[in-house]
Amino acid sequence: MSRPEQGYHLPAVTEGITRRQVLAGSAGLAGILALRQAPAFAQTREIRMLKSSNFVPASDAELKRQGEEWGRQNRATFVIDAVPTGKLNSKKAAVVTAQAGADINALWIGDEDLYFDHLVDLGDLAEDVGRKLGPWTNPDDFKIRNVWKAIPWYAVVWPMTYRTDLLERVGEKVPDTWEDLYRAGKKLKAIGHPIGIALAASDDANFGMRGLLWSYGSSYVGKDGKTVTINNPRTVEVVEFMKRFYKDCMEQEVLSWDDSNNNRCINAGKCSFIFNPTSAYEAAKKQGIKIRGTDRLIHEVMDHALPPRGPVERATSANYGMLGVWRFSKNVDACKDFLRFHYQEAEQNKFIETSAGYNIPFLEKLTGHPIWSSNPKYRFVKNIMKYTHPPAYPGPQTAASQVVMALHIIPEMFARAVTERMSTKEAIAWADKEISEVHAGRKRVTG
């Protein structure tokens, strides 16, 4: 999951689409009620969804299957435009500029504020889904200005992924706190197996460093979403901790990692711990990767655990995937109809299964899916959302919070301090200035 690149316009969707006339007469109405599905459209219409490519390709294949099935039932064509994660922001901005090119869009939490006037209110759909499959996890996290401008889709969470055999080798148990992880990490690095936590311009770094910051009781913005709070004694404490953690437990390569490097590091047999979604484990399992010099499969000695607890709390963040419908779409009713189909329990279960558990829903009923309960290496799923906060926590998600994410200000603050390019207080002051500039509207993402 790399970061935004130069954007370009998407082709516009076909115009001239009309809704099927309502069936007349009691026989027609009875037929609709018997089928219990929306009436098909008299003319074939095209629905386009813009989203990022899932790290588990089978998940995208299942979404495509669902779109095609819904399309057959409704005489519609469903097209998915899946782009690299790093291109999604620029592509979606191009769609809004052109007022064409997509009907349904995958969004990050905070996009609802950024594109508030361009998105359809999905409150009726969200409330209906919540009643059937919920309740929603922390529903207020998703409402912007008290409106459902998008429906929560799935979270990509950042648990610890670790090597059980290496931990046993140094005589340590699964770390419960950051200090536990530091103690184990020193021993692991000494035997050639460092910890890999990105401190670079990546999603892994953005989410990982937010969790660490919160676990020490700090934050970069207040509950009002406006007051910049990064410059405080708790931030000094957590930066000082990361300075010794980097020196004693990690290697310099983490300063330039993208979101694939930590996967490769643990699957190559080097890293002992990473903070990552379950894709590293699933890739090792699917590819049959062996521990170098042995016939043992590496996924057999990999496991997951909740993120460490800090002095104040256990905390982590996540990539909050959302789905929105553009107001400029000529197919708003059809888009909402597809989403109702996609959020049926049977379709959601298939979506979860094909992702091998990567797609973690925000709906309580679905988190008990057997794909997690049947595999002890996924036992963290049941509880991780209790400790998961949106990226701008404790404030609401806003357009400004999206920019702070895109500029990687939080991981850059840590990186400047651990490399001694700046002192701890200088790095924090730099972050304070950068975040304040964003919230004042003087600093934006370009390109």
Residue spans for each PLM region:
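Extracytoplasmic/periplasmic solute-binding protein
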Residues: L35, R145, K149-W153, W158, ...
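Glycine-centered hinge/linker elements that transmit conformational signals in sensory
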Residues: G185-K187, K226-L255
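Short, well-ordered beta-strand elements
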Residues: T44-F55, F78-D81, I104
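N-terminal secretory signal peptides
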Residues: M1-I17
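Conserved C-terminal helix/tail region of periplasmic/extracytoplasmic solute-binding proteins
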Residues: R72, D117, E168, T388-G447
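C-terminal lobe and pocket-closing loops
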Residues: G110, S279-I298, G310-E412, R442-G447
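Hinge/lid segment of periplasmic solute-binding proteins
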Residues: W108-P159, Y182, G208, L297-P308, ...
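Extracytoplasmic "Venus flytrap"/periplasmic binding protein-like
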Residues: R65, E69-W136, K143, D165-D176, ...
